[in-house]
């Protein structure tokens, strides 16, 4: 499946626009990552634990969006946008949302 931030796919004709599809992931940040991030914040540097969590959440949100597009008969998602939100009383939750327009594009048989 082609997934792109562009409003079209160069060289491909969009045959049908299906609907907007979403993939959402909410993940908690664990205590040990918080301690490590706090120390890195104090001393400077990057928090690999938080970065890994962010990457995993983003990839899962995109996979979920792709799955929902496939479920409605789409073979591509265009205009993809990814949003991040920190949630919870102590900002201990991360929400990642991927959204885009599910479409059917022409398939060329060679």
Curated annotation (Swiss-Prot):
Gene3D superfamilies: Hypothetical protein apc22750. Chain B (3.30.110.70). SUPFAM superfamilies: YbjQ-like. It comes from the Bacteria. Transmembrane segments: none annotated. Belongs to the UPF0145 family. NCBIfam families: PRK01119.1. PANTHER family: UPF0145 PROTEIN YBJQ. This is UPF0145 protein lwe0170.
């Amino acid at each position: 499946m082609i997934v792109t931030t562009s409003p079209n796919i160069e060289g491909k004709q969009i045959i049908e626009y299906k609907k907007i599809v979403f993939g959402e992931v909410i993940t908690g940040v664990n205590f040990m990552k918080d301690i490590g991030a706090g120390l890195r914040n104090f001393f400077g540097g990057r928090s690999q634990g938080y970065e890994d969590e962010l990457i995993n959440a983003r990839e899962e949100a995109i996979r979920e969006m792709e799955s929902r597009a496939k479920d409605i008969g789409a073979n591509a998602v265009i205009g993809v946008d990814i949003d991040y939100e920190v949630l919870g009383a102590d900002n201990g939750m991360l929400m990642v949302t991927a959204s885009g327009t599910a479409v059917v594009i022409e398939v060329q048989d060679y």
